[in-house]
Amino acid sequence: MIIGIGIDVVDVERFRRQLERTPGLLDRLFVPAERSLNTRSLAARFAAKEAVAKALGAPAGMNWQDCWIGLDVNGPTVQTKNTVAAVAEAQGVKRWHLSMSHDGGISTAFVIAES
């Protein structure tokens, strides 16, 4: 059963400028394994994290590093711990579905939280 869905779109150039203007933003938003990725990939991962938050009802107090985007043979995966994992567990989320895409300077992500 679908518990929640979320979608987000990020302008890659605007995201790049924000990362450049805001010291520490990269470290605040991303886990170490994500930080070395190019800006387009970071923008897609940020969109995915926003989509996860929306699928969970945008819980207050969500720590950005408690959700990260991994990769396996089937594509991108949603990984959670601490604050995000606790909210997901309380809502009965057992499985995440994630699709990310880039086109024309835009990164987008769509998430389904499933029981």
Swiss-Prot record:
Binding residues annotated for Mg(2+), in chain numbering: D8, E50
Protein's UniProt name: Holo-[acyl-carrier-protein] synthase
Enzyme Commission code: 2.7.8.7
Family of this protein: Belongs to the P-Pant transferase superfamily. AcpS family.
Recorded superkingdom: Bacteria
NCBIfam families per UniProt: pantethn_trn, PRK00070.3-2
Lineage: Bacteria, Bacillati, Actinomycetota, Actinomycetes, Micrococcales
Cofactor(s) for this UniProt protein: Mg(2+)
GO molecular function, a single term: magnesium ion binding
Pfam families: ACPS
Subcellular location: Cytoplasm
Biological function: Transfers the 4'-phosphopantetheine moiety from coenzyme A to a Ser of acyl-carrier-protein.
Originating organism: Renibacterium salmoninarum (strain ATCC 33209 / DSM 20767 / JCM 11484 / NBRC 15589 / NCIMB 2235)
GO cellular component labels: cytoplasm
